[in-house]
């Protein structure tokens, strides 16, 4: 039902930082350079945790006191386990400004047990010490002290968080720099492109750090075709 990549590719991607992933994607010219990633408003709450990679599971939340029936947590859990592991939760908060936090110690533990590696939300999070100790990554717009009346409004639909529209099953990577989507058609080629770009950039870096640096040499290095 959902497209996947190999375990080897997942492992390789999880060892690469977000900026290098984005540079590599640019090298394949599969999308405009200003698309495919969440805006800086969605920040990594735990900048010391390693990159996480997973398949998106999407939903919509609100912390305003609801009227009528809200989405069942059981249905939400069923949706989560229908998506291949590892899972990357993406929740759009319809409250403006964001109010109560869906994410904290309990939800972090529940969703980690369900195979999720982290969450990206334009809402809020809390219980930071406990979530950090758990190793469950939070990418969020802000922090809130309360969960208020937080509840699920919709699940499994495309959502836009931080300017990035995400569908359930999309491949995402997040690290201390933010969150980016990874096109399936090039996912397995990204590690090699990362190495190619690193070799290209190394020429400039080594020149700038060398005792023989000169403006003429910098201009000469600048003539080397960019791989991205």
Question: Which ranges hold each PLM region?
Answer:
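Channel- or pocket-lining gating/hinge segments that regulate access to a cavity or pore
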Residues: 178-180
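C-terminal binding/interaction regions
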Residues: 172
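Feature captures the catalytic cores and cofactor-binding loops of soluble hydro-lyases/lyases
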Residues: 1-168, 182-228
